[in-house]
Amino acid sequence: MYLARSGVFISRIRVLSILNPRFVLLSRRLNHTDSKHYFTDPKTNEIKKPPTFFQHHDSKVNASADDVAQAIAESVRAHKKRRQKVFFSAMLTGIIGVTLGFSISYKVLYKKQESFIPLVPSRKWHRLSAYDAQRVNIDEMKMLGKMRCLSVLTNHEMIREQFGIPLKTDTGEVPSVKSFEVWCEDQDPGVLGIVVRPIDATRDNDSRYHRTHGWHTIPGLFQWRMGTKPIKIRDKFDSFLKFIGVNTGDLLEVINPDREVGDFKYEYPLRKGDSFDGDDDRAMHIWFFGEIDLSQDAMVVFKGKYHVNVKLEQVDLLKKENDQLIRYVLYKNENDKKNG
């Protein structure tokens, strides 16, 4: 830009100097650069500094070589960060575009199939859903849990010595369950995501599918909801063993001869649904936790599983002694750890 403008400016000077010799004298008086010193100073014969039309120049500040090197390094780093940001933004946009294009445009809109878009890992522990809570008799679970807990207490020597037999509270009443909570634990890890299906998809023969899931509709396109897809590691492992010609039963006989094939799967009673909470099994365990007050300074807490019957996992006595809360483990089930 500077050289181009300089060339035009020089040609104009030559024309004017030829047409009017007085212009040469006038230009010299106005300290104009002659034709032999375009890039040098005629007084010192040194190279002129480049023009700084768009730069802020402070002649009072003299930058050292280290400052210049640091400024160049910072400029290179800033440029590298910008390139990385652009690269990752483009890569993320591409991944999202391909995922949405395949899951929604191809599978849902074109193939008219249900699709699942994974987002984040799902929680392993969660509350009972409204549908699952109807299938579990919580009052019966509470009563059975209390009976199993009282059986452990009455057979424990320390409880007999401190509270006597039959077991009663400090007010002379029969111990009762003060607090009782129930929750679920997924057997397999899962992924939380978005379930998308065609807008004209219907399941008239499956009333539970409509009753337990709340779908959101985008008019003219599709329906979507949040769902969880289990990652069945055990099934994949069994499929791999069958592929190489090894039977799961033979493997269990080698690892633990006392364990029956498939006994673990009968521990959970819940959940029959599709692959995203709806035709395959999503294995769950029901856990419960209860509290029983024995006195103002003593409380029993118990925890266990429930399937057809109650199975206690641990019973503890929490007691206040010398202004300190002490925990006594009265019962702990070690069978699952030995068999696992």
Curated annotation (Swiss-Prot):
Transmembrane segment boundaries: 86-106
- For this entry, the transit peptide stretch runs 1-30
Major place of residence: mitochondrion
Task: Keywords in alphabetical order, please.
Answer: Membrane, Mitochondrion, Transit peptide, Transmembrane, Transmembrane helix
Gene Ontology cellular-component terms listed:
mitochondrial membrane
Q: Where in the cell is it found?
A: Mitochondrion membrane
How is it placed in the membrane, per its record?
Single-pass membrane protein
The Swiss-Prot or TrEMBL record describes its family as follows: Belongs to the AIM39 family.
This protein is called: Altered inheritance of mitochondria protein 39, mitochondrial
